[in-house]
Structure formats: structure tokens, C-alpha cells
UniProtKB/Swiss-Prot annotation:
Assigned keywords, A-Z: Cell inner membrane, Cell membrane, Ion channel, Ion transport, Membrane, Transmembrane, Transmembrane helix, Transport
Keyword Cell inner membrane recorded: yes
Gene Ontology CC: one annotated term: plasma membrane
Lineage of origin: Bacteria, Pseudomonadati, Campylobacterota, Epsilonproteobacteria, Campylobacterales
Gene Ontology MF terms in the entry: mechanosensitive monoatomic ion channel activity
Protein name: Small-conductance mechanosensitive channel
One Pfam family matching this protein: MS_channel_3rd
Ranges annotated as spanning the membrane: 22-44, 57-77, 80-100
Amino acid sequence: MDEIKTLLVDFFPQAKHFGIILIKAVIVFCIGFYFSFFLRNKTMKLLSKKDEILANFVAQVTFILILIITTIIALSTLGVQTTSIITVLGTVGIAVALALKDYLSSIAGGIILIILHPFKKGDIIEISGLEGKVEALNFFNTSLRLHDGRLAVLPNRSVANSNIINSNNTACRRIEWVCGVGYGSDIELVHKTIKDVIDTMEKIDKNMPTFIGITDFGSSSLNFTIRVWAKIEDGIFNVRSELIERIKNALDANHIEIPFNKLDIAIKNQDSSK
């Protein structure tokens, strides 16, 4: 009985002391957690005016770093030796780095993209044959909305090591199209017909150089290559479609043949008596 009383006498002060320490640690963690959210949102608000890609990436890094520091301080408040924590984290970090080297290289790739700044949110870019609008640069990956509506998520390490074509660095973009006409066509008439179509299209930038000329002798057609420039804001695909449609109608109106493959089938009658 005396032993139980002794245990209870020792337990309650210790429990009270540990409870106070635990409450302090929880308060420290809650404050740090709230502060990390506050600083992340503040960073997003300040930097998004300049560049949303930069703002999103820096905000994520800031949030994670403050959360790690807060966790270490909270554990230190509980009496855990921070030097031991750092040592363990270092050892675990090496093991994790070896196991997740691709993810770490993606983080490094994201930092490189932030420093070099080859694109920003909303830019139309082409990476490894994929073209679309940049939606976000995250901690590990870059989100690209393709023209058909699909979302491509590319690792930052791949993006940083790939050739990036940014179509938003210029107000105009060149449209190239090959049009085949019959070998018997009047070349000057074909040239004039196509030029008249281009001259009447308001969406074609007349200040940029235009090219219309024969570039190849096809198997069944003279191939004219047409190069014009259109404003990005007008929609390159829409302008190209309208240009092709107008040229087709103009060639038909001038009775200029557009060759196409034909298949002739010859049926030979055989004498059934043989």
C-alpha cells in the first residue's frame, strides 16, 4: 500500500510536468504550422503579381522548410535532443536520397527552371513533342494542358533537360502549308490566286514576310509551299484552317486542279468455255 502511495506521489508531479511540456510543444507546433500557412499564402500573394510559376514554387519550398523547422523545435521542447534528430535525419536523408534520387533530381530541375525562367504560367510551350499551355510548376513536376484537353504531368528533371520551345516569346507565329496542284496548271495563276487570298485575310500579318513558291515536284502534283505569319491571339489553328479553306475555294473558282489519288479497276471478261 505504501508503495502505491509513493508511486502516486511521484506520478502526479511528473505527469503534470510532462503535460505542461506537451502543451508547450503542441502550442509551438500549432503556431509554426499556422505561420507556415500564413507565409505560404503571403508569398503567393506577393510573388504571383510578378510570376505565378515562381510564386507557387517558392511558396511550396517555404512551407516545407518552416514545417521541418517547427517539428524540430517542437520535439526539442519535449526534451528530445535536436542533435540526435539532426543526425538521424542526416542518416535517413542519405538513404532516402539514394532511394529517391529521381525525385530529388526533379526538385533540382524545378530550381533550375525557376532560375532560368524559360516559361511562365499560361505560356504555350513544346517539350519532347508535347505542346500545350503551362498550368503549374510544382515541387516535383510541371503540369501542361495539351490542346486536346488532356493534362500532361512531366517530371521537372525531364523538363530541365529537354529542349523547350516557347511560342509566347513572340506576338506572331509562322504558318506553313504545302498545297499540290496539277502539272497542267498555270503557275502564275496559281501564285496570284493564293496571294489574293492571303491579301484579303485580316488575320495574316502583312508586316511579316510571306512566301509562295514551288518547292517540290510530287508524284502527281506541283507542290506549292505557303508561309505566312499570324498573331498568337487570333488562334494559330483557326487561322490555318481558314487559310486552307479559302485557298481551296479560290482554286476551285479558278478551275485549278487539286490532284488526288485515283484507283482504276479493270474487269477482264474470261471465256467460260475455256
